[in-house]
Design a protein with these regions (language model features):
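Conserved non-catalytic scaffold segment of RNase H-like nuclease domains
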Residues: 2-121, 126-128, 168, 174-181
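Generic detector of well-ordered alpha-helical packing
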Residues: 19-21, 135, 197
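A short acidic, often aromatic-flanked loop/helix-cap motif at beta-alpha or helix-coil junctions
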Residues: 58-60, 138-141, 193-194
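Short alpha-helix plus adjacent loop in nuclease-associated cores
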Residues: 132-165
């Protein structure tokens, strides 16, 4: 029986999360997320979303390339940003109460930012790890025909193995993979966190039927 598979547990709450940051450095003191977006889903359908523009107790230093790619506007940020301390309780509530936390390259990037968010508030993020699903890792497993082996590895261990597995010519970035799946989307607006998440959800709803978890 396959009733243990995620696709058959339709009542589970999934939270997709994505952050836009100052640059690509993973050290929290040099790379704060200025946009934190989340989409909550049940049975593959969006039931709620949050799109926070965030400010901190120091000025942001968004790199030129990052600003261009993400269309960061200092004027818009100054007008719309709210203090991190105000948005964190919602982020924590959504992530802590989700059955699964998802993102594309979440284990390779966003989880480091989430770790810093929790630690900034004197909290541990470790309880999130075992329920984290990285669609980039999982699609890599699909493409390389590497299935999860529950008798010898956890789902998290399986994903980290895939995170560090490379194959020449294998494309796993969100845009490339989604186009391969024939997903329609406003690709020109990618690198806005909420737009990325909407695509991530579409990809998840396609690839879930190919997963053995």
């Amino acid at each position: 029986m396959d009733d243990h598979l995620i696709r058959f547990n339709k009542d589970k709450t999934l939270v997709f999360i994505d952050c836009e940051t100052e640059n690509l450095c993973l050290h929290h003191s040099h790379n704060l997320p200025w946009q934190v977006a989340m989409i909550k889903t049940v049975n593959g359908k969006k039931v709620a979303e949050k799109n926070f523009i965030v400010k901190y107790d120091r000025d942001l230093h968004v790199g030129e390339m990052a600003a261009r790619i993400t269309r960061f506007s200092p004027t818009s940020h100054a007008k719309n940003a709210v203090p991190f301390e105000q948005i964190f309780p919602t982020v924590q509530d959504w992530l802590d109460n989700a059955d699964y936390v998802l993102g594309h390259n979440i284990l390779g990037f966003d989880m480091y930012l989430i770790k810093s968010m929790y630690e900034r508030q004197g909290l541990s993020y470790q309880h999130l790890m075992e329920k984290t699903l990285d669609t980039m890792c999982l699609v890599r497993g699909i493409k390389m025909n590497l299935e999860h082996k529950p008798e010898s590895e956890t789902v998290l261990e399986y994903q980290y193995k895939l995170l560090h597995t490379r194959k020449k010519g294998l494309k796993t970035n969100l845009q490339a993979v989604s186009k391969e799946y024939g997903i329609e989307h406003n690709y020109e607006m990618l690198h806005d966190a909420i737009v990325d998440l909407e695509l991530n959800l579409k990809l998840w709803n396609k690839m879930i039927y190919q997963l053995s978890i």
